[in-house]
Amino acid sequence: MAAKPKTPPPVDSLTRAQAKIEHKRLALEIETHNERYYQKDAPTVSDAAYDALRQRLEAIEARFPDLITANSPTQTVGAAPARGFAKVQHAVPMLSLGNAFSDEEVAEFVERIQRFLKLGPDDIPAIVAEPKIDGLSLSLRYENGELVRAATRGDGFTGEDVTANVRTIKDVPHNLRGRNIPTACELRGEVYMLKTDFLALNKKQEDAGDTVFANPRNSAAGSLRQKDVAITASRPLKFFAYAWGEMTDRPADTQHDMLEWLKDVGFKVNPLIELCNSVEKVLKFYRKIGEQRASLGYDIDGVVYKVDRLDWQERLGFVSRSPRWAIAHKFAAEQATTILKGIDIQVGRTGAMTPVARLEPVTIGGVVVQNATLHNEDYIKGIGNDGQPIRDGVDLRVGDTVVVQRAGDVIPQVVSVVIDKRPNSAQPYAFPHTCPICGSHAVREEGEAVRRCTGALICPAQAVERLKHFVSRLAFDIDGLGEKQIQEFHERGWIKEPADIFTLRERNPKIKLEELEGFGEVSVRNLFAAIDARRTIELNRLIFALGIRHVGEGNAKLLARHYGGIDAFRAAMSEAAAAQTDDGNASEAYADLNNISGIGDIVADAVVEFFAETRNVKALNDLLEEIEVLPVAQARNDSAVAGKTVVFTGSLEKFTRDEAKASAERMGAKVSGSVSKKTDLVVAGPGAGSKLKDAEKHGVQVISEDEWLKLIEG
């Protein structure tokens, strides 16, 4: 049983030697948390726990100033930029804010400003109060009104160049509009994600078996820092502008007027911002925003106060890592203690098995919480995605008294265990190795946190997604049987597995499809004709249609070419699966599969796991009773294009794009989607665009569609 963390002694009671040891430990721990938060977008402690560590470190340094070093977390901002992005030097540092955790500390902040500016006790400086968006800080550089660079905060002095990704965010204007546009300026704000968009993204990630995000801040940061711009573009990121760095000609003299200017030039500015002229009004704003917090569409973790007059901001300047003229008034974490009554397993559309905590109902922030996400089996054991301990390494057991927090106001999370209240009867949780929905065995691939059901073709939880894949364009491509029809036919029990598609006609006298809304006799005849047209299919398309994990269009072709026909493929996979099931030793069939160029361990294991599930094999056998599978002709190695890399561009008149690709592959060529110096041939039709220019740039031969036909027919 894990020991309960000890309460540290008061800082006032520490000797210098004790303080030095604790200072070193705290600094290292905070630096580790900074790296996880700023670089990996995967924090393992709550904001409240992190703030407590910083407060402890600051208290030690206040009592023992000689322990302060240039590298202390109290003297630095964020974390160094991660590898993989170009570094950007900020013209004006992007520093973080000091924190206030009570009304008294806010009043002290205003008093410090008054003393520094030598103002009278009744001369209260105007304060701009704004919600503190919980997202990722971003700096945008504009030159002559045009966006030229975007960078993350990084360590405050050097950030990451994310320009290409930021151009996909609709809230970020590519060109500033209106008048008073400085020759050069750095405009700053926060990238964030709406709560509803975050929940939808996590559902998508969960269904795909990918890592889910802990909160909207992590999802926004992770989405912005993608190497693939297309992924960022697919994520619904938002942006609020609220600050600036370098600026050649400042268009206003107050913070409030600068925010109005930011709106004028095309940015979104938080509409809840208020100008306050007393401490009482500042605190009233804080309480009002706190009451609205749960109903806002986005996450906030406090309120920021800034001196309104910019000349006063300049006079006040900075201290260490933060400005004197601004402070963040943080919200207390919304937590409650309850009992973990059970752990339920949900199965996603792709077989990912996700544990969910069933809790004794408890109210947190005005919301009744009965369930909390547990992410995966490692999370239950007290291990984070990066392999590091979470919750002090304490595992979760049914019957535990747990502390639950509404992470980012959205998804409740179990943040700690009250270990002293653990029942003697509580046992370590055993994550199931079979699917609770269909009973198929569940596997966890090496290097992954997710365990998956292998009953791809027969698991009801996966059925709709698998059937949609089965009839997709690169698989059986059945016209008239789309997502809507698959969903409805499955809900009515008409199609449960692939073979059912091909028995619809004979079952129709009982089903009466023509009586279904949106269908008529003509529609039904057309659907049956489209199904019958797909009773003959190439082996590679069938393999792809099975929806085996890691087996995409390319790998399906590699497998089909290697085995040639369905009988040889089935026999080899059955032998490989049987050997794995019997004694765990690899068979000759597995070795042969694994040695196929381009396949490898991960794909080979996924294929064998599919065939090791007997109900998948039965579903495939039932399907083969209804269809004919054509053997795959071996690619030629003696054609004029064998071994060459070919790119098709523009409109093709004699081929569809898929037919052109297939013709090239039959001739032994490799088809690519982009032109590079490694490309041998570009086949260009009418309307060829950038790929034609790329071919000219790299000196690649360009031919017409007719010339291509002569080449492959000769």
UniProtKB/Swiss-Prot annotation:
GO molecular function, one term: DNA ligase (NAD+) activity
Active site: 132 (n6-amp-lysine intermediate)
Cofactor or coenzyme needed: Mg(2+); Mn(2+)
Keyword presence, NAD: yes
Binding residues for NAD(+): 47-51, 96-97, 130, 153, 190, 306, 330
Source organism, top-level taxon: Bacteria
UniProt enzyme class: ligase
GO biological process terms held by the UniProt record: DNA repair; DNA replication
EC number: 6.5.1.2
Positions that bind Zn(2+): 435, 438, 453, 459
Catalytic activity: NAD(+) + (deoxyribonucleotide)n-3'-hydroxyl + 5'-phospho-(deoxyribonucleotide)m = (deoxyribonucleotide)n+m + AMP + beta-nicotinamide D-nucleotide
PROSITE patterns, alphabetized: BRCT (PS50172), DNA_LIGASE_N1 (PS01055), DNA_LIGASE_N2 (PS01056)
Limits of the BRCT domain: 636-714
GO cellular component: cytosol
One Pfam short name: DNA_ligase_aden
UniProt KW keywords: DNA damage, DNA repair, DNA replication, Ligase, Magnesium, Manganese, Metal-binding, NAD, Zinc
InterPro entries from the UniProt entry: BRCT_dom, BRCT_dom_sf, DisA/LigA_HHH, DNA_ligase, DNA_ligase_AS, DNA_ligase_CS, DNAligase_adenylation, DNAligase_N
Function: DNA ligase that catalyzes the formation of phosphodiester linkages between 5'-phosphoryl and 3'-hydroxyl groups in double-stranded DNA using NAD as a coenzyme and as the energy source for the reaction. It is essential for DNA replication and repair of damaged DNA.
The family this protein is said to belong to: Belongs to the NAD-dependent DNA ligase family. LigA subfamily.
The protein's name in its UniProt record: DNA ligase
Higher taxonomy: Bacteria, Pseudomonadati, Pseudomonadota, Alphaproteobacteria, Hyphomicrobiales
Recorded name of the encoding gene: ligA
